[in-house]
Amino acid sequence: MGNQKNGIYDARTLGMPRMIVLGLQHMFAMFGATVLVPALTGLSVSATLLFAGLGTLMFHVLTKGKVPAFLGSSFAFIGGYAAIAPNGEKELLPYACIGVAAAGFLYVVLSLLIKLFGQKKVMRFFPPIVTGPIIIAIGLTLSKSAIDNCDTNWAVALVAIFVVILANIFGKGMVKIIPIILGVVASFTLAAIIGDVDFTPVLEAPWIGLPFSMEDTVFPVLRHGDGALIFTAVITIMPIALATMVEHIGDISAISSTTGRDFFEDPGLHRTLMGDGVATILASLFGAPANTTYGENTGVLSLTKVYDPAVIRIAALFAALVSFSPKFAALISTMPAATVGGVSIVLYGMISSVGVRNLVENQVDLSKGRNLIIAALILGLSIGINYSGSLTFIVGSVTITLSGLAVGAMSGILLNALLPLEEKDYKGLNKDYMKDDEEDIVEEKKA
């Protein structure tokens, strides 16, 4: 992961106008999934955009501006929202947000523990045979939503796909690095011509508006709310953070593999995890969904090969600004689902391709039964459970819901830790993080 890739690491060489266009491209890439979470949970779309932008900027501050990651709405907590506030009941949503804020706090605690005890003790559980299939699974599980969106109008979706491919493969100069914007514009135009776009919400929306109201935040509930319900929300939702932490490591692995820079070493896992946690706490306090590093934007990095985090920060500023203009937010919301699905198919496929490359570059030997079983279980559980929904179980009076990716990733980590591993099996694994284990094997043989 530490090998420099051929790409643009300093976008200032392109000039500010082009950086702005690239920032807009990242905003378009994340928009569809980011606004879907509040649509499913009943939270505010404008607040979601504001705190996606502010959360991303906070993440960049905490990671020293080194990680080109955008933070958008996390789907992992949808089950938690539904458990506390079924059908998006407005008066119960602040309680769910308190539970999500507690999960963000757990992220912060875990990041401090990693800093205290050293991240090598954590990363030894995440060699390429684990992270590679997890990254592949991230892309493949996301692709289900892309196909669902494409099903609304395959003609519109195919235009987006073809334009993205043509721009990326045959484009020159600026055209080559803005395939997503070109695909969105072409597909959106076709959809508008055939009457697939309803501009009524745009015409009715005001130009300026506040993204959230105080009654939607958690503060009134913290002062005068039901203490028992707050406790229930915390113990129901907080454990989800343990599963999403594994997904976070997969996301950072994907970004590291894409850019050729080891972000586990610099700025460190404790900083990226802290960034996710603080962003989630901030968003939840003001009635927005939990934040997480977004795979869509990793796909954009892989497609355009522009790796400068400054471009992501421009996208974050745009997201925050758009949240204060209901009219612009409505305009972007009119983007047809098929357009979002078309570009997403390419982006999610790029994520899975990064996972395959991770396995190849680290020379993981899949002819060995141990490696094959680990990869098979991660992929089988992640994708299989994702298509059936999620895994739900009850502990006492608490209902816990885990995504397929969380179950698959945790199963792979457990198998990797438990299955016997001989010295020769370390070939191609992450040498820095596995060095301690290699020394343990040598010591055991001496004994």
Residue ranges and their predicted role:
Residues 2, 31-34, 162-167, 178, ...:
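Juxtamembrane interface elements at the cytosolic ends of transmembrane helices
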Residues 6-17, 39-60, 66, 236-309, ...:
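Membrane-embedded helical hairpins/re-entrant loop segments and their flanking transmembrane helices
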Residues 17-30, 156-160, 178-179, 211-251, ...:
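Hydrophobic, membrane-embedded alpha-helices of multi-pass small-molecule transporters
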Residues 81-88, 168, 297-312, 318-323:
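Interfacial segments of multi-pass membrane proteins
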Residues 91-201, 316-429:
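Membrane-embedded alpha-helical modules
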